[in-house]
From Swiss-Prot:
Organism: Haemophilus influenzae (strain 86-028NP)
Protein name (record): Large ribosomal subunit protein bL9
Encoding gene (name): rplI
InterPro entries: Ribosomal_bL9, Ribosomal_bL9/RNase_H1_N, Ribosomal_bL9_bac/chp, Ribosomal_bL9_C, Ribosomal_bL9_C_sf, Ribosomal_bL9_N, Ribosomal_bL9_N_sf
Entry keyword set: Ribonucleoprotein, Ribosomal protein, RNA-binding, rRNA-binding
Highest rank taxon of the organism: Bacteria
Role played: Binds to the 23S rRNA.
Length: 149
């Protein structure tokens, strides 16, 4: 199925690209979320009329994400207190939700979907580097310090 992308989609294309995707992906994800429209003749003409507006919106979203990334980096580190055993192992784990709440409490609004924990949940005390994906191509890193309660 041919669609026109209205937003930058990772591994698929940029704003305005006409791409061929599976019909289920288009019907169930891209079109309902407003990230694409079917590539009919009328939609192509309508998109070309709105191209500048959509590209300006995409640039504004990128600039906002870069500003948030600078705020996250400026925090330096965030401390999270959790119950732990004698050997430095946590009772439970620090998940993306816990990291997002700690960063939001520190003053920068972060959604849990933006937190990336590549090694899974944090299960030990100490310093851990956590990545945040604030936009398709904007990343920030923050030091999360886990201490015993």
């Amino acid at each position: 199925m041919q669609v026109i992308l209205l937003d930058k989609i990772a591994h698929l294309g940029q704003v305005g690209d006409q791409v061929n995707v599976k019909s289920g992906f288009a019907r169930n994800f891209l079109i309902p979320q407003g990230k694409a429209v079917m590539a009919t003749k009328a939609n192509i003409e309508h998109f070309e009329a709105r191209r500048a507006e959509l590209e300006a919106t995409a640039a504004a979203n990128l600039a906002a994400a870069q500003a948030r990334a600078a705020e996250v980096t400026a925090l330096g580190s965030v401390t999270i207190a959790s119950k732990a055993g004698d050997e430095g192992r946590l009772f439970g784990a620090i998940t993306t939700r816990d990291v997002a709440e700690a960063v939001t409490a520190a003053g920068v609004k972060i959604a849990k979907s933006e937190v990336r924990l590549p090694n899974g949940p944090i299960r030990t005390l100490g310093d851990h580097d956590v990545r945040f994906q604030l936009h398709g191509e904007v990343f920030a890193t923050l030091d999360v310090i886990v201490v015993a309660e």
